[in-house]
């Protein structure tokens, strides 16, 4: 299926260079001087087996009304509205600027899907800038070098995933179908019934993280035996190993997984298969433990793994290993919490457990924390409480009007758990912007105490009984 992609971003981040790279010709003028591109330019692009229309746009700038820059911005905004997908480009070497933040907010409010890419990452440059890009709230940034053609494989994967989603005739219908499937899977779900854990079914937990952070050592400590091979060499564990275990009379299915590296470092065929096996373990788990090494800096790959867990709808717990080797634990913990809040805004309040897998200190806190996250993941909120909350939320902050008409939210209901999923009903559901949906999700998380779990929120259109009468009259 053909689709249209608009490359957007502030001036001089490499939009025209990427445009030329994708169309295979130097159709767009490229120079180091900001603002070279003034008019939108379209071309037919090919990437692997994908064919699509690409739009090169003028650099987004803050500008006074009536100026040339303001007219250029209007043209860019029209391109965004015309596109099926936006590719927001930032300069990783320069880091995230106030303009980047400003325009990411604009794009979050737009109904057009967005892929975030960090350009000028050749030779490992711009690592700090890529980390900063997480605070834009647009997911994991793709590292690119438009000039050298690096990172196009990651871009292809993202575009191919988007193209699959376009196979539905209508994007809104696709959301409705997905919600209907989830409702069918949860037939008989009653949000007003208290959650009662199924103690007969095993609690499924996957332990994942970068290589050599101590995953197998932690599993051995929990089991009380040297079940898993461990050592200082990174990558000893090759498969996702499932282990049946019992904790305080409750059955647990525990997965020790292969270390996940960033894709550029995954070269051996066996290691690629190991990573795929780890991804399957994440999808089968109910709670995912991301294990960090307290002695190493927080890396982009950790954020990428957390983003994957959120997308898969699993409960999340951050565990920091080798805590006995930290000189200033309170300061390190404070910085870690701030980094998580800033870089993972989509999962606020993720619980953190600190421990030493080698000595066993702090490991007694792990399973109770996993059980709490599992309870949050299964949370049920009574419909009456939900609607009282929504009335208060709307009274504090009304949805923005659309086309000069107010957007009224009728009611809200929880349609499933695992993870908590809610439907908000409105006669103008399509006009509720992404920013307002995010406001509702944050409110749900804070009010009903749902840390460490993804929250799904769908807008559903209510039928207007007078609409048919107007058509007949």
Swiss-Prot record:
Q: Where's the EngA-type G domain?
A: 3-167, 203-378
Spans through the membrane = none
Q: Tell me which residues bind GTP 1.
A: 9-16, 56-60, 119-122
Gene Ontology terms describing biological process = ribosome biogenesis
**Keywords on record:** GTP-binding, Nucleotide-binding, Repeat, Ribosome biogenesis
Q: Does the keyword Metal-binding apply?
A: no
Provide the residue positions that the database annotates as binding GTP 2. 209-216, 256-260, 321-324
- Record-linked CDD domains: EngA1, EngA2
What sequence ranges are listed for the domain KH-like? 379-463
Cysteine disulfide partners in this protein = none
GO MF terms, alphabetically ordered: GTP binding
What Pfam families does this protein map onto?
KH_dom-like, MMR_HSR1
**Nucleotide-binding among keywords:** yes
The subunit structure is: Associates with the 50S ribosomal subunit.
Function text: GTPase that plays an essential role in the late steps of ribosome biogenesis.
* UniProt xrefs under PANTHER family: GTPASE DER (PTHR43834:SF6)
The record ties this protein, via NCBIfam families, to: GTPase_EngA (TIGR03594), small_GTP (TIGR00231)
Give the record's family classification. Belongs to the TRAFAC class TrmE-Era-EngA-EngB-Septin-like GTPase superfamily. EngA (Der) GTPase family.
Listed name of the protein = GTPase Der
Organism listed in the record: Parvibaculum lavamentivorans (strain DS-1 / DSM 13023 / NCIMB 13966)
């Amino acid at each position: 299926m053909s689709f249209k992609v608009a490359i957007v971003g502030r001036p001089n981040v490499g939009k025209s260079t990427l445009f030329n790279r994708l169309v295979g010709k130097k159709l767009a003028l490229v120079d180091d001087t900001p603002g070279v591109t003034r008019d939108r330019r379209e071309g037919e692009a090919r990437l692997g087996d994908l064919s699509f229309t690409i739009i090169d746009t003028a650099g987004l700038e803050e500008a006074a009304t009536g100026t040339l820059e303001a007219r250029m911005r209007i043209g860019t905004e029209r391109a965004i509205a015309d596109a099926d997908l936006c590719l927001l480009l930032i300069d990783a070497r320069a880091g995230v600027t106030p303009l980047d933040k400003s325009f990411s907010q604009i794009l979050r409010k737009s109904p057009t899907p967005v892929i975030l890419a960090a350009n000028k990452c050749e030779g490992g440059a711009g690592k700090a800038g890529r980390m900063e890009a997480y605070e834009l709230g647009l997911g994991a940034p793709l590292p690119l070098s438009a000039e050298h053609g690096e990172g196009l494989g990651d871009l292809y994967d993202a575009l191919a995933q988007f193209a699959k989603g376009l196979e539905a005739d209508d994007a809104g219908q696709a959301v409705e179908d997905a919600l209907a499937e989830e409702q069918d899977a949860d037939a008989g779900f009653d949000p007003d019934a208290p959650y009662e854990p199924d103690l007969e079914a095993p609690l499924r937990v996957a332990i994942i993280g970068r290589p050599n952070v101590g995953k197998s050592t932690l599993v051995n400590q929990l089991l009380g035996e040297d079940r898993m091979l461990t050592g200082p060499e990174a990558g000893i564990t090759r498969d996702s190993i499932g282990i049946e275990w019992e904790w305080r009379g409750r059955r647990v299915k525990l997965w020790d997984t292969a270390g996940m590296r960033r894709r550029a470092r995954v070269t051996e065929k066996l290691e690629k298969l190991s990573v795929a096996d780890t991804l399957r373990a994440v999808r089968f788990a109910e709670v995912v433990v991301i294990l960090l090494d307290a002695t190493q800096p927080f890396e982009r790959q950790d954020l990428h793994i957390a983003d994957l867990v959120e997308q898969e709808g699993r409960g999340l717990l951050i565990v920091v290993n080798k805590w006995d080797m930290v000189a200033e634990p309170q300061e390190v913990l404070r910085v870690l919490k701030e980094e998580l809040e800033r870089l993972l805004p989509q999962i606020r309040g993720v619980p953190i457990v600190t421990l030493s897998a080698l000595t066993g200190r702090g490991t007694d806190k792990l399973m109770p924390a996993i059980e709490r996250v599992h309870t949050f993941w299964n949370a049920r909120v009574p419909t009456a409480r939900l609607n009282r909350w929504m009335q208060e939320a709307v009274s504090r902050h009304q949805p923005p009007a659309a086309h000069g008409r107010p957007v009224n939210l009728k009611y809200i209901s929880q349609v499933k758990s695992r993870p908590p999923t809610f439907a908000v009903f409105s006669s103008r559901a399509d006009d509720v912007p992404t920013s307002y949906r995010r406001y509702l999700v944050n409110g749900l998380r804070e009010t009903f105490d749902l840390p460490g779990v993804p929250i799904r929120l769908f807008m559903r259109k209510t039928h207007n009984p007078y609409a048919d009468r107007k058509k007949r009259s």
